[in-house]
């Protein structure tokens, strides 16, 4: 039964989602989520560059990671194992870019002591939280799918809302305590999470053995 099957699906096994089996509705949902995450990435990257926020740089990496994850759900699952392995290495590298920017900004803030503009930081955090809430709601119908990527995409959107709350808290605290430390602390926390994510993607890519795919092809 497909994603929109007409029979009672309450007791059916959850559908297996891949790039080839995603039905029209599910693919449309994932595509929208990917687009929203890309929008959030550019918004936070631009604002972070303007106000010098370590937290926003770190959260921009989260948006980039989620965009690439959803893009892989739509496309890369249909690739060969070797191609997916190369894509995973590239994904890990891309995630590192904003994360490194977050650490660099945090170090600069420690030296200069200049805090980001708190109102802009807070408003941007609210915008990012709205984007992540919309993504979480869109993915809610797919969260029980028998696919680690699909469930991971939903969990990532849900967890990103919590990260946005941390950034919003940093902005509010900075309004009353004009210091760079709230932004620095939140930026470092989210940055560490991003480094861990990049490390996991890299290690998973290394663990995938293209020879296994060749063996499977020989058995067919």
What residue ranges belong to the model's regions?
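Alpha-helical transmembrane cores and adjacent cytosolic helix/loop segments
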Residues: 2-220
């Amino acid at each position: 039964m497909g994603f929109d099957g007409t029979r009672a699906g309450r007791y059916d096994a959850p559908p297996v989602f891949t790039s080839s089996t995603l039905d029209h509705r599910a693919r449309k949902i994932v595509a929208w989520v990917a687009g929203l995450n890309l929008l959030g990435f550019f918004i936070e990257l631009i604002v972070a560059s303007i106000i010098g926020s370590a937290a926003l740089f770190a959260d921009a990496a989260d948006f980039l990671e989620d965009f690439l994850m959803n893009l892989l759900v739509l496309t890369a699952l249909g690739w060969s194992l070797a191609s997916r392995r190369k894509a995973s290495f590239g994904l890990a590298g891309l995630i590192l870019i904003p994360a490194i920017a977050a650490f660099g900004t945090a170090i600069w803030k420690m030296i200069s002591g200049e805090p980001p503009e708190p109102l802009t930081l807070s408003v941007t955090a609210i915008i990012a939280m709205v984007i992540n809430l919309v993504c979480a709601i869109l993915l809610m119908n797919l969260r029980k799918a028998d696919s680690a990527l699909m469930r991971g995409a939903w969990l990532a959107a849900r967890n990103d809302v919590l990260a946005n709350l941390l950034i919003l808290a940093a902005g509010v605290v900075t309004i009353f305590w004009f210091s760079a430390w709230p932004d620095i602390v939140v930026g470092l926390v989210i940055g560490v999470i991003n480094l861990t994510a990049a490390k996991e993607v890299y290690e998973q890519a290394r663990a995938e053995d293209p020879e296994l795919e060749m063996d499977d092809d020989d058995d067919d």
